[in-house]
Amino acid sequence: MTIFSVHHATTYRYKRPVRPGQHQLLFRPRDSFDQRLLDCRLTIEPEPVAIRWIHDVFGNCVTLVDFAASTTVLTFDTSIRLEHTPEKSPDFLIEDYARSHPFAYHPEEQPDLLPYMRRHHGDDHAIDEWLARFVTIGASQPTGRLLMTLNEAIAEGFSYQRRTARGTQTPAETLALQQGTCRDFALLMMEAARSLGFAARFITGYVYVPARDGPVRLGGGSTHA
């Protein structure tokens, strides 16, 4: 069992007073069988006129924040403490029917999975051409090995570049540039997996960087897709 403390501060500074619109914050982690939230605090400057909590369609806890006054500085400061009980090693359980690719999801699951199996970006076959370099389309192969091949191809074939600008590159842009951020690589992985018939969607979290028991990890200390 490990206790994690996460402190995340984001500050925006403006040249002239602005009146912030409604902000949607997703910083509260989920409770699960291997994770229990102990404490969660949020401080906002300037003080908002209203704070509301809702759940989105995926069950994520979303904080809606409204402001009444103008400001030149906007700060969100969150502190989280949670108890985490990780597995000693990743244990990726694969149903028997899905151990070899290609496969078909169970009929009762397909209505829920179909939105995540559909490709969301038109790319003039850029993803298909990239996949053809290291994946034999339609040939039977172990599912786990296939997904690891995709993951390794992205890790080895692209360079990580931090980008604070809003938005995500399309998979075609990432393939052309051969570089991107974690969210760009995640989207490329998702679209490639969907091209092969897998259901895929985003998750986000933090990269843990031990302060004294290892070297600094590229991209550590930030949220990641």
Can you say where each PLM-predicted feature lies in the sequence?
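Short low-complexity stretches enriched in small and charged residues
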Residues: 1, 29-38, 155-158, 183-187, ...
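Linear, non-domain "peripheral" regions
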Residues: 1-136, 140
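Short glycine-rich loop/turn motifs that provide flexible caps or phosphate-binding loops at active sites
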Residues: 58, 179, 203-204
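Long, hydrophobic, amphipathic alpha-helical segments used as structural scaffolds
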Residues: 86-89, 162, 193, 197-200
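Secondary-structure boundary elements
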Residues: 99-180, 188, 195-196
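Hydrophobic/aromatic-rich core segments of domains that either
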Residues: 152, 184-225
